Amino acid sequence: MASFVTEVLAHSGRLEKEDLGARISRLTRRVEEIKGEVCNMISKKYSEFLPSMQSAQGLITQVDKLSEDIDLLKSRIESEVRRDLHVSTGEFTDLKQQLERDSIVLSLLKQLQEFSTAIEEYNCALTEKKYVTGAQRLEEAQKCLKLLKSRKCFDLKILKFLSMELTIQKQNILYHLGEEWQKLIVWKFSPSKDTSSLESYLQTELHLYTEQSHKEEKTPMPPISSVLLAFSVLGELHSKLKSFGQMLLKYILRPLASCPSLHAVIESQPNIVIIRFESIMTNLEYPSPSEVFTKIRLVLEVLQKQLLDLPLDTDLENEKTSTVPLAEMLGDMIWEDLSEYLIKNCLVYSIPTNSSKLQQYEEIIQSTEEFENALKEMRFLKGDTTDLLKYARNINSHFANKKCQDVIVAARNLMTSEIHNTVKIIPDSKINVPELPTPDEDNKLEVQKVSNTQYNEVMNLEPENTLDQHSFSLPTCRISESVKKLMELAYQTLLEATTSSDQCAVQLFYSVRNIFHLFHDVVPTYHKENLQKLPQLAAIHHNNCMYIAHHLLTLGHQFRLRLAPILCDGTATFVDLVPGFRRLGTECFLAQMRAQKGELLERLSSARNFSNMDDEENYSAASKAVRQVLHQLKRLGIVWQDVLPVNIYCKAMGTLLNTAISEVIGKITALEDISTEDGDRLYSLCKTVMDEGPQVFAPLSEESKNKKYQEEVPVYVPKWMPFKELMMMLQASLQEIGDRWADGKGPLAAAFSSSEVKALIRALFQNTERRAAALAKIK
């Protein structure tokens, strides 16, 4: 092979292009022969797995020698071409291009040689457990294969064999690295399937082995460092750390953040550090943020020292050592989940429920800052402020949100509690809240301007006739205990707003308004069935609404000078809600009244129109209907007794009794024929109503106090006097009827129209001259 170059160099003077072409052709054929032999060797080695080490070494020697010859020949050709450009430049250029193609083929053969060498060195390193060296050799082989694939000069089948071999060896080293990782990082768990119990936590352990391994190349490394760097070289470090981080979160950090009694214990033994748990009794329902930060910081400090602060040599050949920020890498993977968990399971429970405790929260903010600074020093966190600290610093907003949420939840619980548990309200009743604070100094002048007027001389402005002190008080009645507590909650919340920041005060104020909006929507829906069926609950609900409306009239006025300035311009009012509550209570009670009226009329419909009372069956039916009506009214009188205010009670009972009496009057006046016996029996039925009707007016539990209202029945029952006149007519003579008519000026004329009186006379008396004369007087 050397003779080729010798002959070329021996020529002096002008190089014959024909002779040069012949020599290049012979050189090209030789390159193709070597290429075939190399490909055959590669195929046998990686496809047929035949031992061919000696043959490969011989081929390598031949390739190197041939490469030197080509370089010398190419240099000589270039000098000849430059010297003899006037002689067939194109032909020499073609020869040069052919020679360059041969050079490319030889360079690819060198890449094959380097690939084979890298695989051999990798196998040796893997046998000696030099994982970093092995990983680096695999990466070198990967680069060689990538270069080979970029050129289209080789058989694709051979490249496929090489790719398969590289994949197998990479999976092989990853398997060995995984086994080493499991030996160095050991998790121990409870055999129980319930991994969230305290007993399960106490059996969880993390073992970190720190034993020194033998030297890898020049620099001694701990096994963990060697394994981590090998993972890094292979591009698998991120996934391995992510898996470790998720387990760290699940089995160590989250339990420490959620369980107040759980504490981390660090045990240092020769070549091993153990992280486990112990339980310390505590009365805390939720963990203190400061304690949680301390416990988590302890665990992360151990991990930083034993695992994440190891020197990882990324360039062993040049002896340049740079520390890979493993702590920062792990922090990026777990911090978002960890901080969110700390907020939801720790910080959120530390938010004060009272504005007076907001100053104490500064300690938690400070401990949060110290916790984050410690993590930044350990490189778990970067320099920016995280969501955890932002959450802690935004305490005013969180306090307001939590307070508003607690208020709404408490209010809804009161609204969905039983209505029938009542308390008695009297005009002197007051809401049980602390005394309101005096207005701020800035507002005192305003108060004086509003309430005090300076006069040059003393004047007596007191009116001669004063109102009763209870003129604007709510009348005595019974309301639901839950509604009384609801109003106390509203007052307490507004009182809290007077000592809170402006933002918080506004939120609390509108939370109180939301309470009443919620009442308007929830109570009629939640208690709908009971309000329709039970008259007592309808009356209580009516009182509840009137009680709330009564307080809403002055609620905003009481606090208007003590709330935030933004609320003191007239927006701090609840008066706009008053009509809605009055309408809500009135509609519910009127619906119950309509239902009771319907029942009364239904019972009276079974009286067979009060006709033919001489028939025993008809009389019995009419008597039963009257008794049922009176019984219903008495029952209502009892269930509404001491519940409704006296005036509402009397109006309601008067309306219902008036409905029954009106129906009876209408039925009797519609009769066309009333015999003497019929008249007597009708009178008897009416006498029963007249005697027992007043007894339904019993608004008070003390019977002696009800006599006054029973004597005032005509005031509440418009048809009471016409009913008495009807009874008189059933027993009176024509003369007595005429006297009570008194030419349209008597009591009978006030109760009935002339046509109604004439109809009754025709029904009661036979057609005689006396009846005709009496009818003639009724005009």
UniProtKB/Swiss-Prot annotation:
User: Which source organism?
Assistant: Pongo abelii (Sumatran orangutan)
| Similarity comment | Belongs to the ZW10 family.
Topology in the lipid bilayer = Peripheral membrane protein
Q: Which InterPro entries does the entry mention? A: Zw10/DSL1_C_sf, ZW10_C, ZW10_C_2, Zw10_middle, Zw10_N
Question: What lineage, starting at the top, does this entry show?
Answer: Eukaryota, Metazoa, Chordata, Craniata, Vertebrata
For this protein, the record's Gene3D superfamilies field holds: 1.10.357.150
Q: Name one Pfam family in it.
A: ZW10_C
- Keywords for this protein: Acetylation, Cell cycle, Cell division, Centromere, Chromosome, Coiled coil, Cytoplasm, Cytoskeleton, Endoplasmic reticulum, ER-Golgi transport, Kinetochore, Lipid droplet, Membrane, Mitosis, Phosphoprotein, Protein transport, Transport
Q: What is this protein called?
A: Centromere/kinetochore protein zw10 homolog
Q: How does it assemble?
A: Interacts with NBAS and KNTC1/ROD; the interactions are mutually exclusive and indicative for its association in two different vesicle tethering complexes. Component of the RZZ complex composed of KNTC1/ROD, ZW10 and ZWILCH. Component of the NRZ complex composed of NBAS, ZW10 and RINT1/TIP20L; NRZ associates with SNAREs STX18, USE1L, BNIP1/SEC20L and SEC22B (the assembly has been described as syntaxin 18 complex). Interacts directly with RINT1/TIP20L bound to BNIP1/SEC20L. Interacts with C19orf25 and ZWINT. Interacts with ZFYVE1.
Annotated region (Interaction with ZWINT), positions in chain:
2-81
Main function:
Essential component of the mitotic checkpoint, which prevents cells from prematurely exiting mitosis. Required for the assembly of the dynein-dynactin and MAD1-MAD2 complexes onto kinetochores. Involved in regulation of membrane traffic between the Golgi and the endoplasmic reticulum.
Segments carrying the region annotation (Interaction with RINT1) are: 2-317
Q: Name one GO biological process term.
A: cell division
